[in-house]
């Protein structure tokens, strides 16, 4: 039944489901599961992944808790990547790379925050001493 408008409640539910699903794409083991079950070879599913690219728009991306899911969504647009995901070693490699990225990101962010805090402390103006230097 084409042309039927969805209710606000239906739109909210669809938004929630698509948000959850897109974020699941950040999990390489889930991607491996989808590939091994054949979903990534099905044209309707591949078309759905293409449809979900709207999540890259800032008005939608701001709701994502795991923004690297967008990178996975982008990679899933390529047939070669979808085929490689059948291999558990591929999923394991992606998982390891994600862990390394977050470890490096966390350390770098902590160092940056410490450096900024030190810089702010050094830039704070010192209170002038109020020595009585009035001359008559």
From Swiss-Prot:
One GO biological-process annotation of the entry reads: regulation of transcription by RNA polymerase II
* Compositionally biased intervals (Low complexity): 117-128
Which molecular function GO terms apply here?
transcription coregulator activity
Q: Which domain of life is it from?
A: Eukaryota
For this protein, the record's InterPro entries field holds: Med31_sf, Mediator_Med31
Q: Which Pfam families match?
A: Med31
For the region Disordered, give the residue spans. 117-136
Could you name the Gene Ontology cellular component terms for this entry?
A: core mediator complex; mediator complex
Q: Where in the cell is it found?
A: Nucleus
| Record keywords, A-Z | Activator, Nucleus, Transcription, Transcription regulation
Q: What is its main location?
A: nucleus
* Cited Gene3D superfamilies: Mediator of RNA polymerase II, submodule Med31 (Soh1)
Q: How does it assemble?
A: Component of the Mediator complex.
Family indicated by similarity: Belongs to the Mediator complex subunit 31 family.
- Name of the featured protein: Mediator of RNA polymerase II transcription subunit 31
Q: Give the species this sequence originates from.
A: Danio rerio (Zebrafish)
- The primary gene name is med31
């Amino acid at each position: 039944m084409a042309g039927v408008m969805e209710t606000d409640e239906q739109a909210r539910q669809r938004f929630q489901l698509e948000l959850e699903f897109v974020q699941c794409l950040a999990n390489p083991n889930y991607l491996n599961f989808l590939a091994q079950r054949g979903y990534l070879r099905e044209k309707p599913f591949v078309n759905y992944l293409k449809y979900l690219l709207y999540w890259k728009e800032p008005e939608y991306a701001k709701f994502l808790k795991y923004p690297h899911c967008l990178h996975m969504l982008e990679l899933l647009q390529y047939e070669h990547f979808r085929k490689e995901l059948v291999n558990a070693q591929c999923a394991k490699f992606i998982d390891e790379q994600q862990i390394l990225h977050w470890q490096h990101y966390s350390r770098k962010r902590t160092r940056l925050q410490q450096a900024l805090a030190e810089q702010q402390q050094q830039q704070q103006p010192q209170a002038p001493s109020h020595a009585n230097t009035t001359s008559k």
